[in-house]
């Protein structure tokens, strides 16, 4: 794990649906205020129908909304890569989430809330999402009944959905059709059961008294009950409507616009054979991109350290050139500056490239220890040097301070 690169606080439909339903009520401004109140300056907020994710530069902190998950650095980056690739979605490989990741990053960037680390992480995540889809075609085959139903509705249906039933299968399907993308009405025979079920997802609810009227007012009719007799008769199969029957025995009499549970099982079996191979391919791609991204992050961290040293070198360069010019006014100042700049770059290039090369062979935890020890003492030494030169203090104090710090390290 690298030091304070990115922290992620998240709620999502899979890990704790109840707390997620409370968190998703709040919009972008609410979460940005939470981050601002905790002194966070750089962040990206990803809000979708299925997740609330706060990526930010800073230490973990507690938030009022409970049930959240909190991870940091390489774990957070790995999670983002899986999200962008569609591996953490209800519908594996879906394209919409990649668009949402891109929009979240662009919004943060346009507001000045993204720095070079967040930019690197999100740009790489977007690239990973595109790469996984182009190399594996992972979004083309779903396995679970709810995800297959969701795919069918997304491709062929409208946005007004009648869900008949409030049992286990209905509860697995319900989270897929969140507001505002879909308007869902839950129907059943027991008003108390239907109300309790619908209120979990903030859906509308009705008694199933006039099925024809309910069918007329919706685009998609999904039945998932244990009724022993059909709920929808053949005469009620209105043209232009999509019927999905998940009942066993069947809830809907057969018709041309009825998709049955057996048909969905066949889709699932076919896709299951392809899915495992595609997920494995995607994981390999993500692992490779993670290694490349971690190395780039290490480079940025090392560059940050040496940028302070370059600043020190620039101060020394300016002052020494001024001294030299007093003794040799005939020398062209621009040529002298170019020469000095070239010498500094060539000298500092050796430790920079060496440290970057060493970091490639270090695990993240080993690099962390090395970096923390090196950067702490190095920054103290350079800060003392800068103060000495910029303040024109006695260079003897600089030598003494440097010697003490080196002995301490």
Swiss-Prot record:
Any single GO molecular-function term of the entry would be: NADP binding
Protein's pathway: Porphyrin-containing compound metabolism; protoporphyrin-IX biosynthesis; 5-aminolevulinate from L-glutamyl-tRNA(Glu): step 1/2
Entry keyword annotation includes Disulfide bond: no
> Out of the domains of life, which is the source?
Archaea
- Name the residues annotated as catalytic in the UniProt entry: 49
Tell me the protein's name. Answer: Glutamyl-tRNA reductase
Give the protein family: Belongs to the glutamyl-tRNA reductase family.
Q: In the UniProt entry, what is the domain comment?
A: Possesses an unusual extended V-shaped dimeric structure with each monomer consisting of three distinct domains arranged along a curved 'spinal' alpha-helix. The N-terminal catalytic domain specifically recognizes the glutamate moiety of the substrate. The second domain is the NADPH-binding domain, and the third C-terminal domain is responsible for dimerization.
Group of enzyme by EC: oxidoreductase
> Which parts of the sequence bind NADP(+)?
165-170
Primary role: Catalyzes the NADPH-dependent reduction of glutamyl-tRNA(Glu) to glutamate 1-semialdehyde (GSA).
Q: How does it assemble?
A: Homodimer.
- Name the site position(s) for Important for activity: 79
Signal sequence segment = none
Instruction: Supply the alphabetized keyword list.
Output: NADP, Oxidoreductase, Porphyrin biosynthesis
EC numbers listed for it are 1.2.1.70
| A Pfam family that the UniProt record links to this protein | GlutR_N
Tell me more from the record: During catalysis, the active site Cys acts as a nucleophile attacking the alpha-carbonyl group of tRNA-bound glutamate with the formation of a thioester intermediate between enzyme and glutamate, and the concomitant release of tRNA(Glu). The thioester intermediate is finally reduced by direct hydride transfer from NADPH, to form the product GSA.
